[in-house]
């Protein structure tokens, strides 16, 4: 992987060279997340709030047989135009590069790319986790493996409500991933505040969390550090309403023979319907809140932490 060409935008390259805070972002949410033009509105809102914190945004994606870090307006247009870029997880990076396709990176791909490219901290709205039917399908997201094996700080709103959040928390513990709540003592469920899985470690102080994360990355652990941010009460969806929608949709999915990756879209459509599409608004708002929290943590990291990543590339 270290022989793969990496193309940095001038802004990201300058930030790397000078130890400025940088925040990695996935491109899949731009290409395959919200419908147009809400996807662009969300991207621009996130870009603005990251910059307002004095942090450089670094969108990750693949084009022209290169891993790209930092997007120009032309790149953003490429990632949102039809035909859509292919969705790239960590396992797909090499093939996407070899085939010369345009790739929109998921969380797992972005975490891998961030470590490779010297980007120390990455933010995403929702991670994958352990599925509720794990005993039958053995379905566990690659996101968990990537967090455990990459020296990258990850900031997220947890995992979606239809996953098995207590089991996801247990897997992260088994993998040795530190999980810390930023302003929350409960493992958040994306656009829901409650999950029933409580966190052993949490803090209100971004500097304290940044210090702990940097210490883990530099000296303690072989892998990453996960920081969880719960949605504010103003934007969060009702936990019971979403849980009922999830349970009904999973029963319907089983009776209709919906399996594997198709379950995610099936359940998300059910939640959209049950909430009168308020879930799409919540998706937008959660992403903005998470990148704001991530940017606060990024700017709390010392310049030496970012400069050291350049030396290790």
From Swiss-Prot:
Protein name: Pseudouridine-5'-phosphate glycosidase
Cofactor details (free text): Binds 1 Mn(2+) ion per subunit.
Membrane-crossing residue ranges in chain numbering: none
Protein's job: Catalyzes the reversible cleavage of pseudouridine 5'-phosphate (PsiMP) to ribose 5-phosphate and uracil. Functions biologically in the cleavage direction, as part of a pseudouridine degradation pathway.
MF GO annotations: hydrolase activity, acting on glycosyl bonds; metal ion binding; pseudouridylate synthase activity
HAMAP family: PsiMP_glycosidase
Gene designation per UniProt: psuG
Listed GO CC annotations: cytoplasm
InterPro entries found in the cross-reference section: Indigdn_synthA-like (IPR022830), PsuG (IPR007342)
């Amino acid at each position: 992987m270290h022989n793969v060409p990496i193309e940095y935008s001038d802004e990201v390259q300058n930030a790397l060279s000078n130890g400025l805070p940088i925040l990695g972002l996935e491109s899949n949410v731009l290409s395959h997340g919200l419908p147009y033009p809400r996807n662009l509105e969300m991207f621009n809102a996130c870009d603005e709030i990251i910059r307002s914190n004095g942090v450089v945004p670094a969108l990750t994606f693949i084009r022209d047989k290169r891993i790209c870090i930092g997007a120009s307006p032309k790149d953003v247009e490429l990632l949102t135009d039809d035909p859509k870029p292919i969705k790239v997880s960590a396992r797909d990076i090499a093939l996407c590069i070899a085939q010369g396709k345009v790739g929109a990176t998921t969380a797992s791909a972005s975490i891998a790319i961030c470590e490779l490219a010297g980007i120390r901290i990455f933010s995403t709205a929702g991670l994958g986790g352990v599925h509720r039917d794990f005993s039958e399908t053995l379905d566990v997201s690659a996101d968990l493996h990537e967090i455990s094996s990459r020296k990258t700080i990850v900031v997220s709103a947890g995992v979606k409500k239809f996953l098995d959040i207590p089991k996801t928390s247990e897997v992260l513990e088994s993998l040795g991933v530190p999980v810390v709540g930023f302003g929350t003592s409960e493992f958040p469920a994306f656009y829901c505040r409650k999950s029933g899985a409580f966190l052993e470690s949490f803090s209100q102080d971004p500097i304290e969390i940044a210090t702990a994360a940097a210490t883990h990355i530099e000296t303690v652990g072989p892998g990453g550090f996960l920081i969880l941010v719960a949605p504010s009460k103003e934007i969060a969806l009702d936990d019971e309403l979403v849980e009922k929608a999830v349970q009904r949709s999973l029963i319907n999915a089983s009776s209709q023979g919906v399996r594997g990756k198709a379950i995610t879209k099936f359940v998300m459509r059910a939640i959209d319907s049950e909430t009168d599409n308020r879930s799409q608004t919540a998706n937008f708002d959660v992403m903005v809140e998470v990148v704001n929290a991530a940017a606060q943590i990024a700017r709390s990291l010392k310049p030496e932490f970012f400069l050291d990543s350049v030396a290790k590339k």
